[in-house]
């Protein structure tokens, strides 16, 4: 007698839709050079209990649908026994805490990584006076400041997730950096998360260029 296959606790059709959305956007980010050597991870809220996320160790420029898996909001695989990114908890803590967050993107561009090293000592990069600050949801003027927090890198994701958790309610955040690592950015959907990610990339690049121009020769 054949065992009855248990129904999936999520919509397979919705997963297929999100996999295509993720793969297309991730491929563009890979082509920009922001996901070197299989690095980076990406996710999208699937429903109120699950997220679609990239499988660990896959070339982000060559993803196929099987490279997108499902995890619950505790970071545990659901449906297929695949290994999610080591940093899955940094995604799921955002979905669990903020129901409005629909997409989380994590990249490793040179600009993001260099900025994270340069500002690790202060733990923050202040961005102010830029017109592009209005790219962040809720900002309506350049006459404001956005503090991008820089967290120390660690292989203990429980520790890092707890550090992030402690600061999520203390200021407006659209993303943060991890020292020597890269950038996390999020939004209500893929389009908004991409906008925030690209705004951070541009503004961090401007800050690095200003540092060079101000340095004595």
Curated annotation (Swiss-Prot):
Binding-site positions, Zn(2+): 106, 108
Keywords: Amino-acid biosynthesis, Lyase, Metal-binding, Methionine biosynthesis, Zinc
Pfam families referenced in this protein's UniProt entry, alphabetically: Aldolase_II (PF00596)
Domain of life: Bacteria
Protein name, UniProt field: Methylthioribulose-1-phosphate dehydratase
GN (gene name): mtnB
A GO biological process held by the record: L-methionine salvage from methylthioadenosine
Transcription keyword on record: no
Molecular function GO labels: methylthioribulose 1-phosphate dehydratase activity; zinc ion binding
The keyword Lyase appears for this protein: yes
UniProt source species: Xanthomonas campestris pv. campestris (strain B100)
Gene3D superfamilies: Class II aldolase/adducin N-terminal domain (3.40.225.10)
């Amino acid at each position: 007698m054949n065992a009855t296959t248990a129904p999936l606790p999520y919509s397979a059709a919705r997963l297929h839709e999100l996999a295509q959305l993720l793969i297309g956007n991730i491929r563009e980010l890979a082509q920009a050079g922001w996901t070197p050597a299989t690095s980076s991870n990406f996710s999208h809220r699937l429903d109120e209990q699950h997220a679609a996320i990239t499988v660990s160790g896959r070339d982000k420029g060559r993803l196929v649908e099987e490279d997108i898996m499902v995890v619950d909001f505790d970071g545990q695989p659901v449906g297929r026994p695949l290994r999610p990114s080591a940093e899955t908890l940094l995604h799921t803590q955002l979905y669990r805490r903020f129901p409005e967050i629909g997409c989380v993107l994590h990249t490793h561009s040179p600009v993001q990584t260099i900025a994270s090293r340069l500002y690790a000592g202060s733990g923050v990069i202040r961005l102010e006076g830029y017109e592009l600050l209005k790219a962040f949801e809720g900002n309506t003027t350049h006459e404001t400041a956005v503090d991008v927090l820089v967290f120390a890198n660690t292989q203990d994701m429980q520790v890092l997730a707890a550090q992030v958790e402690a600061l999520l309610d203390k200021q407006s955040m659209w993303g943060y950096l991890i020292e020597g690592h890269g950038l996390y950015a999020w939004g209500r959907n893929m389009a908004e998360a991409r906008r925030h990610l690209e705004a951070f990339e541009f503004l961090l690049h401007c800050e690095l260029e200003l540092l060079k121009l101000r340095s004595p020769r």
